[in-house]
């Protein structure tokens, strides 16, 4: 009798155990107990409210092993970008004291209920570039389609969530790094498919930062009052 049942290939079996290990590693990380500044540009405040409350994902909507691998590859590429910029003469600080064991730069407000961690702070650049410092540095990895869109339209139009993060971080980091909001942030986008790099100077948008801060306060107030914010599809 012919057996038409699919039998996992060697690659599928290996990937399955890898994904299981990655998922277990992620599950062991304590969940966030704060509103992350990197997420406040999301269009749906109810979704952000659910994230802050630690609501479990709908069944079948958990991150797949492949998605978790994509996240980790993004972090690895960010580390490469840091090395490349430093090698090119950028004085780029990613941790306090620029030590591997140093704390990541970031901010904490509203009793620790709103927090953010920055990718880096630029203290100096090659003089010929004419980039003002200190400056915030934020790095994202993208597939080719999203990368091309960002190059063509700019991060503010193409990726408003990222633009919101940049503005908020410039505002809240001013207390720790005076002058950081006076200078445009440097946004780096890495094309994961081709290794092309896009760099863009993003001036501080005080109005956008204020709107994101107001949104965070609105979410916290709704949580404290037990109210459910409107859902935006």
What is the meaning of each model-derived region?
Residues 1-136, 143:
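Metal-dependent nuclease catalytic cores that hydrolyze phosphodiester bonds in DNA/RNA
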Residues 93-94, 136-138, 184-189:
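A structural signal for short, well-ordered beta-strand segments and their strand-loop junctions
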Residues 6, 149, 153-163, 168-233:
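Metal-dependent nuclease catalytic regions and adjoining charged, substrate-binding loops involved
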């Amino acid at each position: 009798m012919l057996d038409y049942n699919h039998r996992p290939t060697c690659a599928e079996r290996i990937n399955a155990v890898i994904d299981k290990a990655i998922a277990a590693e992620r599950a062991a990380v304590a969940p966030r107990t704060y509103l992350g500044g990197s997420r406040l540009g999301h269009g749906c405040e109810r979704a952000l409210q659910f994230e802050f409350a630690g609501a479990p994902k709908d069944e079948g909507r958990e991150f797949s092993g492949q998605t978790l691998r994509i996240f980790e590859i993004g972090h690895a590429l960010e580390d490469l970008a840091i090395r490349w910029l430093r090698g090119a003469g950028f004085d780029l600080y990613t941790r306090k004291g620029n030590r591997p064991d140093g704390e990541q730069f970031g901010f904490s407000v509203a009793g620790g209920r709103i927090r953010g961690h920055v990718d880096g702070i630029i203290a100096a650049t090659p003089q010929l570039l004419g980039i003002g410092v200190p400056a915030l540095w934020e790095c994202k990895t993208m597939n080719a389609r999203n990368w091309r869109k960002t190059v063509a339209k700019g991060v503010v139009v193409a990726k408003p969530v990222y633009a919101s993060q940049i503005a908020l971080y410039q505002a809240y980091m001013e207390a720790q790094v005076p002058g950081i909001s006076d200078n445009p942030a440097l946004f780096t986008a890495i094309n994961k498919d081709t290794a092309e790099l896009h760099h863009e100077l993003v001036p501080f948008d005080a109005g956008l930062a204020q709107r994101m801060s107001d949104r965070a306060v609105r979410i916290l107030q709704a949580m404290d009052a037990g109210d459910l914010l409107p859902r935006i599809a």
